[in-house]
Amino acid sequence: MILPKRTQEKEISLLMHYLDEVFPLQFPFHERRYVGKREWLLTILASTRPVYYATLSLSLLHKEACLHEFEAELAEIWQKEKMRYYILALQESQQQLDALDTAYGIAKMKGNIHALASTLQLISFESSSLSKGDWQLHLRAGTSLIPVLIDGWAVALKSDKVASSSSLWTELDASDFNATHDEDSLSYEYVGALKFFANVLAMFGIFSCISIGPSSPFMEYRFLMDQAGLIQMDQIMGCRNWAMLAILEIGTLDKWKREEQENRRLSLKALTSRAMAIEGVLESGLREASGSALVDLITSIYATSALTYLHTVVSGLNPNLSEVQESVAATIVLLKRLPDLRAAKSLVWPLGVTGCMASRSQEDFFRGLIISAGATPRALRNCWGLMKVWEDTWKMREYMSKQPPERWEEVVSGQGPPMLLM
């Protein structure tokens, strides 16, 4: 993109701010030892206008969050620029999607990766505690790309671009540096981007299930998760696939249960059988994830929180149930083992589920954890927003023990727009 020099300087500065400050906040558990590290990232961010503008708006959102109260004049300027870039990102995204209708081959694959990248940046923007916007619209757009992303991954698997080394640079040959070389396959950078963004889409999608309930496209996310070698959540969010799959299965069980209830044909035998199968997977995984590595600890936190989710789907959102109390207590034990409590800021989903089902004696632990984690009201992630969700839920505790609310989405979002627990 050719821009006036002064504009270009400011935008490059914002891009670097994103790389240095925002990306690590979005993905603090991103494992850099694996293929591609972040060597593909700048290529994708600067590749097309939608991705570029969405990233700049996200960078300004973070800068705005870091301002002090006495910097109101500067905040107003940044807010205007933030919204300008955001609107540009929306406009360019629509044009990009329209252009995909006439694209084909490698150009279409790259276009789909660009579309996914810009969509996920817009979800991060809209779902932030600073925006509280319509992230569902963008998530639906991202989900619609799943079939073509899987096709792209199948093509990549047939090429030599899915490297086994720790850096894509060890696999390059002279043709990769030849400017006149016609591309007949995705480059290493684009394969790395495809894999990364597909994992992020799966993560957002699975987390959204508890926020929006049965309207979630469970089968599409399951289809994505089942792609061999593509989804490796531990590399992105520190949690292994089996725990995230279990969360997805619990959401699917919740949908099935509601449909059966609506049709007055719910079989408690079938419900128990399905729930026990999921519980067995979680308990088996927890036994295997008993190591000292951080990925084992993070995975276990998600798994014990998933047990709480499962018990509430089966028996209702009642914090007085013994099985709920056991899984909540188990999660608290694991949270106390975090080597750095600041990591808790990135565990919004397990904190949301576990905290809502906490007992009165456990309330102060969760309040203190948010403070110790360094969460603030003005942050990209929704960790601070959990405080209101918890407090509102705790006020209803006595009512919940007598007549539990039937839907998690009512607890998570209250009367406001759905909250993405990430």
Curated annotation (Swiss-Prot):
<keyword id="KW-0804">Transcription</keyword>
<dbReference type="GO" id="GO:0045944">
    <property type="term" value="P:positive regulation of transcription by RNA polymerase II"/>
</dbReference>
<comment type="function">
    <text>Transcriptional activator of all of the trichothecene biosynthesis genes. Acts upstream of the cluster-encoded transcription factor TRI6 and is necessary for full expression of both the other trichothecene genes and the genes for the primary metabolic pathway that precedes the trichothecene biosynthetic pathway.</text>
</comment>
<keyword id="KW-0539">Nucleus</keyword>
<comment type="similarity">
    <text>Belongs to the TRI10 transcription regulator family.</text>
</comment>
<protein>
    <recommendedName>
        <fullName>Trichothecene biosynthesis transcription regulator TRI10</fullName>
    </recommendedName>
</protein>
<dbReference type="InterPro" id="IPR021858">
    <property type="entry name" value="Fun_TF"/>
</dbReference>
<keyword id="KW-0805">Transcription regulation</keyword>
<dbReference type="GO" id="GO:0005634">
    <property type="term" value="C:nucleus"/>
</dbReference>
<dbReference type="Pfam" id="PF11951">
    <property type="entry name" value="Fungal_trans_2"/>
</dbReference>
<dbReference type="GO" id="GO:0003700">
    <property type="term" value="F:DNA-binding transcription factor activity"/>
</dbReference>
<dbReference type="GO" id="GO:0000976">
    <property type="term" value="F:transcription cis-regulatory region binding"/>
</dbReference>
